[in-house]
Structures are given as C-alpha cells and as structure tokens.
C-alpha cells in the first residue's frame, strides 16, 4: 500500500491524533530532518482547520521534534552532534532511574518472560540479522519498565527522548557487533532486576547507555 492510500485513512482526525500521526512520520523518518511541514497541504490531507494544524505544530515544537523558523515555517528539527551527546547524558540518568524504580516496585517474577526473550530468541534473531526483532525486544523492555516504574513525569520525559533519538537508535543497531552487545547488556540488566538488586540494575543500565554513546562517537560520520 502506497503512502497516499495510507494517509487517506486519517482524514478528519482529532487534535491528539493529528499530533500522533505527524510524530510517527517524524520518528520513522518519513519526514526526515529539515523537511518542511506545510500548513495548506496538511489541512487538505487531514480535512482540518489551519488553526488545528498550528496547534499540532505547537505540541511538536514543545517536544523538540520541529522548529518554527521565521519566513520558512515549520521544519523538522535536525539534531547537531553536541545535542546527541547531551541526549545520551540525560538518557543515561533517566533510564537508569526507570530501571531502579521498576526493580523496586515490581513483584518477584515480573521479569522472567523478558529474561527469556533476551536469551535464545534475541540471540538467534541477531544471528539471522533480524534487527527488527531486536528493536521490538528493546521496545518491550522500555514499556515494561515504564509500567513498573509507575512515574508519569519520568515516563513523559523518556517518551520525548525516544521520539528525538528513534531514528538514530535504529541506525546504531546496524553498527557491527552493536546489536549483540545490546542483547548481552540487557541480559545483565534483567538479571539484576530479576534478583531485585536495584543498585546493580541501575548501574548496569547506565553502562548500557554509555556504551551506546561510545558506539555513536566511533561511528558518527556514518550515522548522521
């Protein structure tokens, strides 16, 4: 199904849904950095008012996904290298905290299925170069941690970070050896969570993010 036909299904949508559709296009790189979002085209496509489109632009701008530039309009944000390092610094702290809270709050046995998922299934997926399976494992891990951490402020901050770094994360798993390293690192995090050791789980998760930042530093000219 082509993009035009897919998009025809989302006409006349609510303000929240309009934001979500545009967010997904940006995060998936259907709208890559530097792309211009044109009010007139969007009002026609979605059959909504220009005021509603501007409202959606305001939400996306607050999330750091677009910027509104005088005489140019709304443009998808292009991350600079320094910003990416800053995002990794914040992710390290916040993801570490999420893992800590999840470990402290979740009942025993909560992580058994994820431990199994990151075992043979994830390893076999990497061996056959099924990186989408690995990315899905990461998404499941994040969602479960967010649910168990049960902190709406923290989860909102992390959602914003994931939106801004989603494409980069997908590119990073293509770096030789990175996906397998990620599986091993998540195995270690989950083992600590399964044991109820919040201190170790947090530190292990923070090392995982530092490792990702180091991989980005090594291969950044191929990733940007």
Task: Name these PLM-found stretches.
Residues 87, 108-171, 183-192, 200-211:
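Conserved amphipathic alpha-helical segments that form helical-bundle/coiled-coil interaction surfaces
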Residues 17, 41, 83, 133, ...:
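An acidic, carboxylate-rich microenvironment
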Residues 1-104, 213-224:
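Short linear motifs at protein or domain termini
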Residues 102-106, 149-153, 169-176, 216, ...:
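Long, hydrophobic, amphipathic alpha-helical segments used as structural scaffolds
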């Amino acid at each position: 199904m082509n993009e035009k036909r897919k998009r025809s299904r989302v006409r006349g949508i609510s303000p929240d849904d309009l934001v979500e559709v545009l967010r997904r296009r940006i995060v998936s790189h259907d709208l890559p950095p530097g792309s211009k979002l044109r009010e007139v085209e969007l009002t026609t496509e979605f059959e909504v008012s220009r005021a509603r489109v501007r409202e959606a632009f305001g939400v996306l701008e607050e999330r750091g996904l677009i910027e509104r530039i005088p005489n140019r309009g709304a443009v998808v944000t292009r991350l600079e290298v320094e910003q990416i390092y800053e995002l990794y610094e914040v992710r390290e702290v916040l993801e570490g905290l999420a893992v800590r809270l999840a470990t402290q709050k979740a009942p025993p046995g909560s992580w058994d299925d994820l431990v199994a998922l990151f075992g043979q299934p994830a390893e076999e997926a990497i061996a056959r170069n099924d990186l989408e399976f690995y990315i899905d494992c990461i998404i499941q891990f994040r969602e479960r941690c967010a649910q168990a951490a049960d902190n709406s402020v923290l989860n909102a901050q992390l959602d914003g970070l994931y939106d801004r770094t989603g494409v980069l994360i997908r590119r990073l798993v293509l770096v030789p050896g990175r996906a397998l390293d990620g599986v091993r690192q998540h195995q270690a995090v989950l083992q600590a969570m399964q044991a109820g050791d919040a201190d170790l789980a947090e530190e292990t998760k923070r090392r995982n993010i530092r490792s990702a930042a180091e991989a980005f530093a090594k291969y950044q000219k191929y990733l940007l």
